[in-house]
Amino acid sequence: VNINKLVLGDKGKNKIFKYVPHGLNNKLFSKLEGDDKKLVDFKKALQLPTDLDFHLLFNSRNIRRKQIPDTIMAWKLFTDKLSEEENKKCMLTLKTEAIFEPGTDLPAVIEYFGVNNVRILDHKLSTQEMNLLYNTADGVVLLSNAEGWGLALTEAMLSGTPFIAAVTGGMQDQMRFEDEDGKWIEFNSEIPSNHHGRYKKHGEWALPVYIKSSSIVGSPSTPYIYDDHIDPKEASERMMELYKMGKEERSRIGKLGMEWALGDEAGFTSEKMSNKIIESTDLLFKTWKPRNKYVFLKDTEYVKRVLPHKLIY
């Protein structure tokens, strides 16, 4: 759904809205076989243990809203339920800055939680190398409390990798939640988000972590915006769920996500995104009418901007 349509309300009655989701080059991000020579060499270069049973990947900036400490806490809760031998065959890779002022000191967080199977990759990788990194992973995790889209999830899907993610912002668009009729959900002014889990049926490639706390934050330029937070305990349960699936099942659901991302319904490829932009631009030129040189407005016609939906939905 186009968020502009919800925000504008009656002011958007005579406007045309088109939803164009993010798309990526599916020739750069793609599924590789386990014996692919480049993938094997990349694993050696990263010094990844050859006997790993479970490799979880986080890929984003070290900034506060990405909630990396919550991810590490969830990992701690998850690995505490494993035996010492099982722990040795699990790894969480954080592809991000180790220490960054807009975020935090991640080595200190890792030390605080006492987890030995978390590593940080803070050097730059090419797009081709990033695709290799996704292909080393059994799953991707992104628990942001505010996220416009979450490109790491799209990259994961195109590489055939399932993901664990917070149900907020555009990340829920990539989970394919279904409505009562089995259709990909279209949000409206009554139900603008599924962050609290009204709808539970979703694509198998997604392991959603529903929001436990929504607060209101803001600034003078943006007076109010929702700040969604997950419970790390629930995130740890999704990690355990993905872990217990085994490699064959993880590969199966990852393939389902890849097929959906490549298909016409989702269209998360750069080619499909470009075609939608072309179609929308053509429609604009066909329907566009020049604005009047001037308009008269009554400054007494002030309409208050009031919450358009129930707080609990």
Predicted regions and their residues:
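A short helix/loop element that forms part of the nucleotide-sugar donor recognition site in Leloir-type
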Residues: 30-49
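Short hydrophobic beta-strand element within catalytic cores of glycosyltransferases
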Residues: 162-165, 175-176, 182-189
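Short alpha-helical donor nucleotide-sugar binding micro-motif in glycosyltransferases
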Residues: 132-137
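A short, active-site helix/loop in glycosyltransferases that binds the activated sugar's phosphate group
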Residues: 1-19, 24-32, 105-108
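C-terminal amphipathic helix plus adjacent low-complexity
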Residues: 200-313
